[in-house]
């Protein structure tokens, strides 16, 4: 599942004010069996991955934003392709963040470019890990 922050708040049935509440809401959805892995897109702040093992936070590379249209779709598609290629969930999320960031660099409804995604992939960072 890949909600954005607003969608996570709706799924959790509560307002989410800070990182601790983001993590608690995401873990609760995993623990309640809604999904095995939850990737929450946080826009320019990156993303978080929640699994039964805990939370991993990732930073997104800084880019010049031309349009946000399609960023979430690009992120989901890149995660899916990466997993289908046999990459780890963590590496797939990193690739997804790169693709979502790359999509914001394109005008209008144009989706991400692979060359931009590959270049940005090297700039996505694992920020923190919190074990459950």
Q: Which residues does each predicted region cover?
A:
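Conserved phosphate-binding/catalytic region of the ribokinase-like
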Residues: 19-132
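Conserved beta-alpha-beta core of the PfkB/ribokinase-like small-molecule kinase fold
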Residues: 1-24, 46
């Amino acid at each position: 599942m890949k909600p954005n922050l607003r969608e996570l708040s709706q799924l959790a049935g509560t307002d989410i004010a800070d990182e601790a509440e983001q993590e608690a809401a995401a873990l609760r959805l995993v623990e309640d069996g809604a999904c095995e892995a939850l990737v929450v897109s946080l826009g320019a702040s990156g993303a978080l991955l929640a699994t039964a093992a805990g939370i991993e936070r990732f930073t997104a590379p800084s880019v010049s934003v031309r349009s946000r249209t399609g960023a979430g779709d690009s992120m989901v598609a890149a995660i899916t392709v990466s997993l289908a290629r046999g990459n780890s969930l963590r590496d797939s999320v990193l690739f997804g963040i790169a693709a979502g960031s790359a999509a914001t660099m394109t005008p209008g409804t144009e989706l991400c470019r692979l060359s931009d995604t590959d270049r940005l992939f090297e700039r996505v960072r694992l920020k923190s890990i919190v074990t459950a």
